[in-house]
Amino acid sequence: MGYLVEFDKMLWNEPAKGMRTKAFVSGKQQLILLEFSDGFIEPDWCQKGHAGYVLEGEFSIDYNGIIERYKKGDIIFIPSGEESKHKAILGKGEKATLLLFEIIDP
């Protein structure tokens, strides 16, 4: 078993227009390379917990009406649960790439 995660050898998945992902899963943990682009707004509130690093670009997250802006180099920690529900928001022409770390719920 190797310890190198080679995202460059993985194919992109596109779960929604303006959102692409590559995921590496090991047991109950996963790493996700996530790319948002061009006016993407998540249609539903996410209640998953995430820890992540913004690799490129800028974007906003709506935390139930409170908007926070993130840029390249920022680290994000979002606890799971209703009180931390959130949606990613990108303006027209914006693009952002993130590396997310998640624990997979049973």
Region spans (language model):
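Short acidic-glycine-tyrosine-enriched beta hairpin
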Residues: 65-81
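Short loop/turn positions at the edges of beta-strands in beta-sheet-rich folds
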Residues: 25-28, 55, 80-82, 92
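Ligand-binding loop in jelly-roll beta-barrel domains
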Residues: 80-106
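Short strand-coil-strand connectors
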Residues: 27, 62-66
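Conserved short histidine dyad/triad with adjacent acidic residue
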Residues: 30-46, 80-81
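A short, N-terminal "cap"/entry segment at the start of jelly-roll beta-barrel domains
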Residues: 1-28, 32-33
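Short, conserved beta-strand element in jelly-roll/cupin
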Residues: 36, 45-61
